[in-house]
Amino acid sequence: MALTALPPLGAIGMASPLFAAAPAFPGFGLAGILLTATGLTALATGPRRLLLPAVPLLALLSLVAHVYAPARPRPPAQIHAISTRLGRSPTDLSSWLNRNLALRTLVRHTLHSTPSGSTLLFPEDAAGPWTRWSSVFWRTTAALARARGDTVLLGATLADPHGGLLDALIGFGAHRVVTSARQPIPLGSWIPAGRRSYRADWSRFGPTTIAGRRVAVLVCYEQLLIWPAAWAFLSPHPPGLIIAVSNHGWATPGIREPQIQANAATALARLFGVPEVSAANGPRPIADAGSRKASDLHPEQ
């Protein structure tokens, strides 16, 4: 079980049985994962003489977890998640410019409508490819955010200095940060032998610090895996918040994967006993498919 839950095999181990730790041991975090792994392994391979004492013990620990689990904590009031309906990522200069113009309008509007000192979270790949012109394009917005003491977090595709691409979350304004997915989706983004593959990072442990907060950032596919969240909490100073960003601009009506992914992120937050803030991008409204304007972004805070 550990082989399929941890990288490299864990790179494709979505919907692991270890997700049972969330309802079984809420708030237990890493200990809950270990207890679940122990219980499932014992049920599958253990001799009956060991199961008789083990099952009641695990049931008792689960009861303790439910009795003493704190109420689901609320996210910090300073963090505002804005979901969008931008559709698929831009593939040419014209679509990139139109998308970023509309996104910039929304960012500036949100800056003016939230209290100073806020952190604004936008979805995975909201800004599309981050080029050398992106910093120029966003310069005045970054200055506005900095003057207000705000931090803006945009999902973007970033060129990796070591080759390939990064599925990144870029922060500017009062606090600057760049972090990226530990595990992009296999074959779709992460192609180990591909020259333009998104890079995986299996050796990065601990939280990311954003606007003075220790957070666990889960980018899209990572929300369906156990180990990226576990890696973030393997620290003497674990995160106090899960930030989940995703991009489902490709989704068609009836696709359930976005909801399954959102449920998985919520389960991880329950397991580790921390609040969750999420921002997702969805498909563009069918009626407006021929044009894009600021109102297409449909902010949801």
Each predicted region: which residue ranges?
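Membrane-embedded alpha-helical bundles of multi-pass enzymes
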Residues: 1-65, 275-276, 280
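Short, contiguous clusters of charged residues that form electrostatic/catalytic patches at enzyme active sites
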Residues: 31-39, 101-108, 200-202, 226-227, ...
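Hydrophobic alpha-helix-in-membranes signature
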Residues: 52-55, 122, 206
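Non-cytosolic juxtamembrane linkers/loops
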Residues: 60-112, 253, 257, 267-269, ...
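Soluble catalytic regions of membrane-associated enzymes that act on cell-envelope
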Residues: 69-185
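Solvent-exposed soluble domains appended to multi-pass membrane proteins
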Residues: 127, 132-135, 139-147, 157-301
